[in-house]
């Protein structure tokens, strides 16, 4: 007999860059703030939007990947479970926090150049080194193919254009 199901699926956009921390044992814990927006019509037929903010945590290897590639404004798909925790604050008051513990993550709406920096790329050194890693492999395979023009870069927007 099943004891219950705790499954959460979210598709949304990051409200800020990931917060990356490490345990004493070296495990990565990455926390993001993810916005999801639902749309419905009210009694008068007017469109109403409601945005919910979710605190999502990634652990271990998934935390490393999320911290490396997700950025403010990035869109992603997340599967995980919901967790409610209670703690005592510095003022002695009991506080409650609701978090999504991610088991799976898929980046959506990313850049076509393989950089994965969907939200603006504030770590250009890593992005550049990744492009260098990819370039020799592509060139090694292309001589047998007819010459093709490369797709235009998608750097034609600024972080200020993203509403998050």
UniProtKB/Swiss-Prot annotation:
- Motif placement: Important for interaction with partner proteins: 159-164
Q: Which GO-annotated molecular functions does the record name?
A: single-stranded DNA binding
Instruction: Using the record's annotation, list all stretches that form the SSB domain.
Output: 5-109
Alphabetically sorted, this entry's keywords are: DNA damage, DNA recombination, DNA repair, DNA replication, DNA-binding
Q: Name one GO biological process term.
A: DNA repair
Q: Which GO terms describe its cellular component?
A: nucleoid
UniProt xrefs under InterPro entries: NA-bd_OB-fold, Primosome_PriB/ssb, ssDNA-bd
Compositional bias per record (Gly residues), positions renumbered to this chain: 111-122
Q: Pfam families annotated for this entry?
A: SSB
Q: Where is this region: Disordered?
A: 105-164
Q: What does this protein do?
A: Plays an important role in DNA replication, recombination and repair. Binds to ssDNA and to an array of partner proteins to recruit them to their sites of action during DNA metabolism.
- NCBIfam families according to UniProt: PRK08763.1, ssb
Report quaternary structure and partners: Homotetramer.
Could you tell me what this protein is called? Single-stranded DNA-binding protein 2
Q: Which organism is it from?
A: Xylella fastidiosa (strain 9a5c)
Q: From the UniProt record, report the name of the gene that encodes this protein.
A: ssb2
């Amino acid at each position: 007999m099943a004891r219950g199901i705790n499954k959460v699926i979210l598709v949304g956009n990051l409200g800020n860059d990931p917060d990356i921390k490490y345990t004493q044992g070296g495990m990565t814990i990455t926390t993001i703030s993810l916005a999801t927006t639902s749309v419905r019509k009210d009694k008068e037929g007017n469109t109403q939007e409601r945005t919910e903010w979710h605190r999502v945590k990634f652990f271990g290897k998934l935390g490393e990947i999320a911290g490396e590639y997700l950025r403010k404004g990035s869109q992603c798909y997340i599967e995980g479970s919901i967790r409610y925790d209670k703690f005592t604050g510095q003022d002695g008051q009991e506080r409650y926090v609701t978090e999504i513990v991610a088991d799976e993550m898929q980046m959506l709406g990313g850049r076509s150049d393989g950089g994965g920096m969907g939200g603006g790329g504030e770590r250009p050194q890593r992005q550049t080194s990744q492009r260098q890693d990819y370039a020799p492999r592509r060139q090694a395979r292309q001589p047998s193919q007819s010459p093709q023009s490369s797709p235009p870069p998608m750097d034609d927007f600024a972080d200020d254009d993203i509403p998050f």
